[in-house]
């Protein structure tokens, strides 16, 4: 009942002025009442943003597809790396002018210190981390404030990461004030202790990703990992947004299949083959058997004659449950970060076990034995490959970790690529809206990063190993 009331409140917020405007109108939306309670603004920012980052387009059709968690079984253009420019424009503009605009409004108005301010800083860092990981250089220091600039400069990823790490450290130190987050907290239901752990864990994610680029990041990461109680320490503390058990405000992947009538994706052959080779107990959760009773993944970029019956559909827990959660960060990921940063085999095995437990299965001795032997032979490859498996359902993070490390190495250019020889796309294409609104700064960023005329291939991201 509490969840239903929260989502009814969200509908009220959306219809009372949560509409999106052009990039240069952030913080000046005349349809957004200035006296809306901050908890309502937080609710809108979290709901709109997470539904976008974990929705069918950004999560499945692009990031999750290019990370080869999923494969297209019809309308497979994106599996050939042909993209729709309006999709990337919608995601880029939608994150800036919706959730980030709302969060900046909270930051401008919330008492300092306060739990509300800390939550807004945390979610702002979360969204910006995804934006820069997908697009590289983006507006950051001059963004979200038209008083500073209506044509904000594009900042280097090193600048953005440093700012996000600072904000997350500030947020973690601030949680524990007396103010109530109210009904707007769709992540932890007002538990600021868990919010603090999420802020610290997200900081660990960013520090780990860039530790080889900045010695101070590596030092800060080791200090953070030395205090595991300050991080997500169990599956009960996972950062996730759940949905009411109805078809109206449902899990966006469920909504895409049942409300929109789309069934364009299956699990990838890359995923199924890797899980089968190690007898992974999560396979029945991630995938459905085909009509012949077998687990068969769809080869990325390939047209199958009878894909709806011959290959495995996405597991029911992810696609067929209207109340299924969108997961932002997990205990398993924290353990994999520790395993990589500290060369800790036990943390790696614990991460595998935590991911299995998250999905209601047991990591048996035989499975852990296979995984342990793989670690002994190739530690980093094993850690990232299992991290990629644990990230199923979080396409953006899986895509980022593959681009950072090159693992799993089973992910390769599809045979029918529209850009043969270029490999897997290195980035999302910049939005067409910026060509008209911020052309000079956009073109300078494109030149600095070596973005070619496809828009999706460039120099490696700053954090590439």
Describe the residue ranges of each PLM region.
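Bacterial Sec-dependent N-terminal signal peptides
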Residues: 1-28
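Hydrophobic alpha-helical segments, especially transmembrane helices
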Residues: 3-6, 47, 204
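Membrane-proximal, proline-rich intrinsically disordered regions
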Residues: 19-67, 75, 79-82, 94, ...
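Structured, solvent-exposed acidic/aromatic patches
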Residues: 35-39, 70-364, 376-380, 386
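Short coil/turn segments at secondary-structure boundaries
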Residues: 57-62, 286-289, 395-404
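C-terminal functional modules
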Residues: 352-356, 363, 368-465
């Amino acid at each position: 009942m509490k969840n239903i009331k929260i989502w009814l409140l969200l509908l009220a917020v959306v219809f009372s002025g949560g509409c999106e405007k052009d990039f240069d109108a952030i913080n000046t939306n005349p349809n957004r009442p200035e006296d809306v309670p901050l908890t309502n603004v937080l609710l809108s920012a979290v709901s709109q943003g997470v539904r976008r980052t974990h929705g069918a387009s950004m999560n499945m059709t692009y990031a999750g597809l290019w990370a080869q968690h999923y494969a297209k079984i019809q309308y497979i253009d994106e599996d050939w790396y042909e993209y729709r420019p309006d999709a990337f424009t919608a995601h880029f503009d939608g994150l800036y002018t919706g959730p980030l605009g709302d969060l900046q409004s909270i930051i401008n108005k919330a008492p300092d210190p306060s739990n509300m301010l800390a939550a807004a800083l945390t979610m702002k860092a979360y969204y910006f981390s995804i934006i820069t990981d997908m697009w590289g250089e983006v507006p950051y220091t001059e963004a979200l404030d038209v008083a500073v600039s209506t044509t904000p400069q594009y900042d280097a990823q090193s600048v953005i990461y440093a700012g996000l790490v600072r904000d997350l450290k500030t947020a973690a130190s601030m949680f524990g004030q007396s103010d109530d987050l109210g009904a707007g907290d769709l992540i932890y239901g007002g538990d600021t202790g868990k919010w603090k752990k999420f802020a610290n864990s997200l900081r660990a994610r960013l520090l780990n990703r860039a530790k080889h680029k900045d010695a101070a990041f590596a030092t800060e990461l080791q200090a953070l990992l030395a205090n595991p109680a300050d991080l997500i320490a169990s599956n009960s503390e996972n950062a996730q947004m759940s949905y009411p058990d109805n078809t109206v405000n449902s899990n966006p992947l469920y909504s895409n299949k049942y409300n929109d009538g789309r069934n364009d994706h299956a699990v990838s052959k890359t995923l199924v083959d890797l899980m089968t080779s190690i007898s992974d107990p999560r396979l029945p959760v991630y995938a459905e058997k085909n009509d012949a009773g077998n687990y068969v993944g769809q080869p990325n970029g390939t047209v199958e004659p009878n894909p709806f019956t011959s290959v495995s559909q996405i597991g029911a827990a992810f696609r067929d449950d209207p109340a299924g959660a969108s997961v932002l960060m997990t205990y398993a990921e924290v353990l994999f970060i520790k395993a990589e940063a500290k060369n800790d085999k036990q943390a790696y095995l614990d991460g595998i076990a935590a991911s299995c437990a998250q999905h209601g299965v047991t990591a048996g001795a035989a499975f852990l034995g296979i995984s342990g032997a793989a670690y002994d032979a190739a530690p980093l490859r094993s850690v990232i490959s299992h991290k990629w498996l644990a990230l199923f359902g979080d396409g953006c993070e899986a895509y980022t970790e593959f681009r950072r490390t090159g693992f799993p190495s089973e992910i390769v250019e599809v045979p029918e690529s529209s850009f043969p020889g270029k490999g897997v796309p290195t980035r999302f294409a910049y939005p067409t809206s910026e060509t008209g609104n911020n052309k000079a700064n956009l073109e300078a960023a494109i030149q600095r990063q070596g973005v070619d005329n496809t828009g999706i291939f460039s120099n490696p991201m700053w954090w590439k190993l």
